[in-house]
Amino acid sequence: MTDLHSTVEKVTARVIERSRETRKAYLDLIQYEREKGVDRPNLSCSNLAHGFAAMNGDKPALRDFNRMNIGVVTSYNDMLSAHEPYYRYPEQMKVFAREVGATVQVAGGVPAMCDGVTQGQPGMEESLFSRDVIALATSVSLSHGMFEGAALLGICDKIVPGLLMGALRFGHLPTILVPSGPMTTGIPNKEKIRIRQLYAQGKIGQKELLDMEAACYHAEGTCTFYGTANTNQMVMEVLGLHMPGSAFVTPGTPLRQALTRAAVHRVAELGWKGDDYRPLGKIIDEKSIVNAIVGLLATGGSTNHTMHIPAIARAAGVIVNWNDFHDLSEVVPLIARIYPNGPRDINEFQNAGGMAYVIKELLSANLLNRDVTTIAKGGIEEYAKAPALNDAGELVWKPAGEPGDDTILRPVSNPFAKDGGLRLLEGNLGRAMYKASAVDPKFWTIEAPVRVFSDQDDVQKAFKAGELNKDVIVVVRFQGPRANGMPELHKLTPALGVLQDNGYKVALVTDGRMSGATGKVPVALHVSPEALGGGAIGKLRDGDIVRISVEEGKLEALVPADEWNARPHAEKPAFRPGTGRELFDIFRQNAAKAEDGAVAIYAGAGI
């Protein structure tokens, strides 16, 4: 057994110690559910008859309690490009299950929002809380007691974390994530940036912008940038919840179909009546969560996962915080550059070696815990292999080779950066996260006057009026989970990018979120405590000097201490109801802080 890197070992040990009581309570829960919870043998005849009434040819199998019944929770809709392929999955999966003597039922559906559609719109204020709704819907779906295993169909931003948060309440069930894959590549990313900035400057019209956007987002599958959706897939791969190499195979291909078939066959093998029982609650543990953070840092993944990973972990009784991310970032090298951290997209990453190469390199550097349980029989080492179809059309896995393009992937011995993509900033403004992997190091330290806003639309107005044509740190506050649901502010990126290109020192500080697609412009985000909770960001005034320094790990308002301490907090803007946002008031009231995952449904749930 090779030695684990000392920092990874140290962080893992403290996560285990910090989680000792909560993890024990969780394991006790899933053991109880396995032994005494509701399952088919414990249902009444009437319960069972209702459960398989519409199943036609599968009824005999469903009456046989020695056969595995897999509950599918699907996030299908055909507005969300990544989820459109799931239209075909349930019927295909039923066929695949019958091949191994099992059955499949659609246990339920969950909503799936597209942040690309709601970006900059009122619906974005429901986006983060949709994760909690998805968790609740997943729990409802699996509550019928008809299933010995689960298959979760989800890809995008809040959907995968929500599915896992709900499924972990049924952690005694073997569970697999079944992805659909990325869309084929559209226009070059540099061209996308150029046209968006031209539009922000008023140099082209809406038709030209829409033509570009439609050429970029043009088919079924995930968006091809390395944002939150594709970071989800990386995390699932490192957690061992996919069939190895499933993450980035495009939809509608023979390999994609073969991987879906293999996923159904594999979860059917994992029931507790067999000899390879692997429940979800044992796969997600302290060590696998640390591995997920390592994967995030090594690939420059989405900042949203500084909330999603803690939220998922907490559902399994595991407690992580931003210090864990920061300490791991100091020793985990950046070995992948995928847009927005570089010019190449997720398909080019896959063709260059993809997740198999990333995991191979991280294992070789002893940066991953090896003693973890995965869906794959051989453990985490199996994820250092890439899937392929042999000449007979059979699914096989081949060891990862060398990267096909060193502008996308590099070995640990020659990384893009010696440390990871995310940094913790601290100071008299609170704690915040910073995505260093997407920002030119010359912008890692910025000291400038602030311009304070409480609404992203007002930032756009100020930009168009020329009021931001100077060195400026734009502050957008009252964007935290308890204020308005913590929307993403990605709509501001083109305007801030124009200012940066014009030679100004510019940055953004916010208690809100930014899209996983955000890059280039320095952003201190998820500032905690948030403004509504009395956070110091609520004290800032126009003209205050703020210093952001990645090297120093600082986020400071350079205001004399006596004056700073005496300042009152700004008042929260009036809430504007509409588009259903008013229905989420109970979520806003109960949301945890960003560092704890900004989860509302855990309050009072003993989680």
Curated annotation (Swiss-Prot):
Keywords: 4Fe-4S, Carbohydrate metabolism, Gluconate utilization, Iron, Iron-sulfur, Lyase, Metal-binding. Gene3D superfamilies: IlvD/EDD C-terminal domain-like (3.50.30.80). GO terms for cellular component: cytosol. It catalyses: 6-phospho-D-gluconate = 2-dehydro-3-deoxy-6-phospho-D-gluconate + H2O. [4Fe-4S] cluster binds at C156, C223. The keyword Metal-binding applies. Binds 1 [4Fe-4S] cluster. Its cofactor is [4Fe-4S] cluster. Its EC number is 4.2.1.12. GO terms for molecular function: 4 iron, 4 sulfur cluster binding; metal ion binding; phosphogluconate dehydratase activity. Pathway: Carbohydrate metabolism; Entner-Doudoroff pathway. One of its GO terms (biological process) is Entner-Doudoroff pathway through 6-phosphogluconate. Pfam families: ILV_EDD_C (PF24877), ILVD_EDD_N (PF00920). This is Phosphogluconate dehydratase. The lineage of its organism: Bacteria, Pseudomonadati, Pseudomonadota, Alphaproteobacteria, Sphingomonadales. The gene is edd.
